[in-house]
């Protein structure tokens, strides 16, 4: 016998959608936008680390 909790009752509607697929493209475009933003973030971090992107008063001296 399962224990019924208030949190379980609140989350039950989310679980009832399990296995269903949204019609059409669904949220794929939103995922694509976030992937591009994450890629841009990684490129900026890489450029700062590689000193390709110079920022005022930002030192990339790892020795101290």
UniProtKB/Swiss-Prot annotation:
Membrane topology: Single-pass membrane protein
Membrane spanning residue stretches: 29-49
UniProt GO MF annotations: phosphate ion binding
A single Gene Ontology CC term: photosystem II
Keyword vocabulary terms for this entry: Chloroplast, Membrane, Photosynthesis, Photosystem II, Plastid, Thylakoid, Transmembrane, Transmembrane helix
Keyword check for Lipid biosynthesis: no
Subcellular locations according to the entry: Plastid, Chloroplast thylakoid membrane
GO biological process terms on file: photosynthesis; protein stabilization
Superkingdom of origin: Eukaryota
Family of the protein in this entry: Belongs to the PsbH family.
Summary of the function given for this chain in its UniProt record: One of the components of the core complex of photosystem II (PSII), required for its stability and/or assembly. PSII is a light-driven water:plastoquinone oxidoreductase that uses light energy to abstract electrons from H(2)O, generating O(2) and a proton gradient subsequently used for ATP formation. It consists of a core antenna complex that captures photons, and an electron transfer chain that converts photonic excitation into a charge separation.
Subunit text: PSII is composed of 1 copy each of membrane proteins PsbA, PsbB, PsbC, PsbD, PsbE, PsbF, PsbH, PsbI, PsbJ, PsbK, PsbL, PsbM, PsbT, PsbX, PsbY, PsbZ, Psb30/Ycf12, at least 3 peripheral proteins of the oxygen-evolving complex and a large number of cofactors. It forms dimeric complexes.
PANTHER family, alphabetized: PHOTOSYSTEM II REACTION CENTER PROTEIN H
Protein name: Photosystem II reaction center protein H
Organism the protein comes from: Cyanidioschyzon merolae (strain NIES-3377 / 10D) (Unicellular red alga)
Gene this chain is encoded by: psbH
């Amino acid at each position: 016998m399962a224990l019924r909790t208030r949190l379980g009752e609140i989350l039950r509607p989310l679980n009832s959608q399990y296995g269903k697929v949204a019609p059409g493209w669904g949220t794929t475009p939103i995922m694509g936008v976030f992937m591009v933003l994450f890629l841009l973030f990684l490129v900026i971090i890489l450029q700062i680390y590689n000193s390709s992107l110079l920022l005022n008063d930002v030192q990339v001296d790892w020795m101290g």
